[in-house]
Regions:
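Conserved RNA-binding domains used in RNP assembly and mRNA/RNA metabolism
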Residues: 1-179
Length: 179
């Protein structure tokens, strides 16, 4: 007998190069990471969503009962709970020790301060190339739009599309408070 696929709606904040979108999306037991990494679909469907320009994030330009986003255009996805990511086996494989690395990430539009959990020693080339999954999981995230400081997104967990990365700085402990 085939087991039914468990599905649930989860709230998520999507950032593209020009828009801030908040809505709910239907995910299976593989969570948001499974949805974003599904090679059989190039889009994400949102329900009960609102869209704002990053220039004025407090001014909603559109409410929609259904909206579709192209996965390749999603810079990052903010989630309210780490459980929404999905299976930890998708996020990381094996039984290795995971270390926390404070990082500062820049994209053409956003600056992100977060904690990257990574197995083993921090090596930028491995972080950027490991696996076929384009999304990195970041924790305790603070995101601002460089040119539009009114946009300020703080979330416990975020999936970041590494295709949009301009720079990544491993912030040494103790140096985080400087700035």
């Amino acid at each position: 007998m085939v087991q039914p696929l468990i599905t649930r709606n989860i709230p998520a904040e999507f950032l593209t190069a020009n828009h801030y979108i908040f809505g709910q999306t239907l995910v299976s037991n593989t969570g948001m990471l499974g949805l974003l990494c599904d090679p059989t679909s190039s889009f994400v469907e949102l329900n009960d969503s609102s869209m704002a320009r990053i220039v004025k994030p407090d001014k909603i330009i559109n409410y929609a009962s259904s909206m579709w986003l192209v996965k390749n255009q999603i810079v990052c996805v903010g989630l309210g709970k780490p459980e929404y990511i999905g299976s930890t086996s998708l996020a990381r494989s094996g039984y290795t020790r995971v270390y926390q690395y404070p990082v500062q990430i820049t994209t053409p539009v956003y600056e992100i301060q977060a904690t990257l959990e990574w197995a083993g020693r921090f090596d930028f080339s491995i972080v950027m190339s490991e696996g076929s999954n384009p999304f990195l999981t970041l924790y305790d995230v603070k995101t601002i739009a460089s040119l539009f400081p009114a946009l300020n997104v703080e979330t416990p967990v975020m999936l970041f599309n590494r295709r949009f990365l301009d720079s990544l700085v491993h912030v040494k402990r103790g140096a985080e408070s400087k700035g």
